[in-house]
Amino acid sequence: MSRLLSVPGGPYAPPVPARELTVTAADGARIHVEVHGPERAPAVVLAHGWCCSTAFWAAQIRELAADHRVIAYDQRGHGRSPANPAYGTEPLADDLEAVLAATLAPGERAVLAGHSMGGMTVMAAATRPAVREHVAAVLLCSTGSSRLVASATVVPLGEGRVRTWLTRRILGSRAPLGPVTPLARRILKYGTMGPGSGPHMVEACARIVHACPRRVRHGWSQVLDLLDLDHGVRELRMPVEIVVGAADRLTPPSQARALAAALPDCVGLTELEGLGHMTPVEAPELVTGKIRALAAAHIPSARAERAVHAEESA
């Protein structure tokens, strides 16, 4: 589904994976997984956000797969992972743990990048054995750990009960999104992207978001409304870097700053002027560079490969 409804060409068109597999989570949920790049290359795992799919990471996959093994999966109910009646942060953690166990060798380390709900998945799974075993470093893009509805600035009012009530009604709406029209693009850009985002970026995100089933969109909106993962943030003991758009209306910079203050080992916080919530699409080179740098710094095989390349070019 995610490949059929995404843009057909350009940097945001989903690359064809080297292989695909279905992973079964603890409760029986079936999770669609794609693997790109050389099998023995340093591993990167990508977890997308609410209403998205593996297609959201197309730009990162395209660049990283040249010299990394890139593992991307569809969150339950999204993309090509079938819907499941279980909604909650524990099922998200179950799914991530199952993906790590199925795609990484015992003791193998990877960089884990999560955008929005994907970042929340990382926080929810912070104490899971598979995360402790396999995750060498984390990149959190445009995410938060609690008070999401209260802190969102989609509604242009001051913080308070009225704004929170209106935001809850908007984000939790059961209304169908319908086809991707010029009006739909304008609405999506206002809510999720910065003023500098080009039409090709808006088109890519609109196609991905509009492909999400209405029931799935609403079900996960209820989880995000009640989200409280502050405890999970404190359990992320590996190096963690954060990226946020300064114009992010869904998880504003205040969320990123709170994460940076709470993390045991925050190695950087980058606030991107003029960008919104969809940072991997709006700033693809920067996000890809952050992932690549974390892999080079924290995965032994990546460090060795970088040293070999340096010697060859000397």
Residues of each region from the PLM?
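Conserved alpha/beta-hydrolase catalytic His-Asp/Glu region
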Residues: 146, 173-234
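Conserved acidic catalytic loop of the alpha/beta-hydrolase fold
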Residues: 93-109
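Conserved HGGG/HGGXW glycine-rich cap/lid loop of the alpha/beta-hydrolase fold
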Residues: 29-83, 89, 102
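Gly/Ala-rich beta-loop-alpha elbow adjacent to hydrolase catalytic centers
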Residues: 114, 118, 122
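Conserved alpha/beta-hydrolase "acid-adjacent" motif
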Residues: 249-255
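Short beta-strand/loop motif that positions the catalytic acidic residue
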Residues: 236, 242-244, 248
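Catalytic histidine-centered segment of alpha/beta-hydrolase-like enzymes
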Residues: 250, 269-289
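Flexible "cap/lid" loop of the alpha/beta hydrolase fold
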Residues: 127, 131-171
